[in-house]
Amino acid sequence: MDPISELFTKGYTILPSLISEETCDALTKYLDRNFNEDLPYNYTKGHHQIHLPQEAADFPEEIVFNKKIHEILAEIMGSSYYMYSYTCNANIASENQPFHMDCTHYHPVDTVRKFGSPGPPFQIIVNTYLQDTDESNGSLEMVPNSHTNTYFESDEDGRIQERYIGETERCNLPKGSVIIRDKRTWHRGTINFKDKTRYMVGTGYSMAWYRLENRLKFKDCEDVFYDCPFSAWNLDLNDCGN
């Protein structure tokens, strides 16, 4: 199955070993220098979020501008999609996250049921492993086909009740592998049993018509983003404030 068909059907697709070891290692060194256990976390302590480089010297161009990734995104979302999220998961967790969805369906669930489908993705997340990742150090756990499920209950934070979780898949993959997922697909972060932080880059992309208010800030990056493969309307390229 080709990547786009798999993303539509399964809710995610995988591109193994897409990003070079050099890029992964350089970014890991940057993140190690900036990691601390007081960082914010999602759902469960240890599932931290850490800032990615905002200055041109350390900016991971191979990840953010990767041609293969953006060929897929452009075919799904057209030429005017934009990057609304630029962050990294730093996992030292001793507990799993709850299964959750990062966003709900665009229309009310009753409307989606009557229509027969929630429609194609309007937001897509691209995750990149910076190291070999498996059950020992917190591989992402996905619920295949869950992005089209409309018969479930969740709380206001997107947690899915356990009784609705069926078959799952652990994304056990080598360094530099990329997971492209419909933002509605259910998933969770898992325990990292090792004593080294597991990093997973997360860049989020949205259809042009679904405009979010948050702006991404960079410093001295005009040349870096010149002719980038997505719309830069929401990027402040000479402002490194967080």
Could you tell me what each predicted segment is?
Residues 1-9, 15-117:
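Non-heme Fe(II)-dependent double-stranded beta-helix
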Residues 14, 179-180, 202:
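Hydrophobic beta-strand signal
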Residues 20-21, 88-93, 104, 133-135, ...:
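Short, solvent-exposed loop/turn segments at secondary-structure junctions
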Residues 44-47, 142-155, 193-204:
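C-terminal/domain-terminus segments
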Residues 95-172, 211-216:
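Catalytic core of non-heme Fe(II) oxygenases with the double-stranded beta-helix
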Residues 185-242:
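Non-heme Fe(II)/2-oxoglutarate
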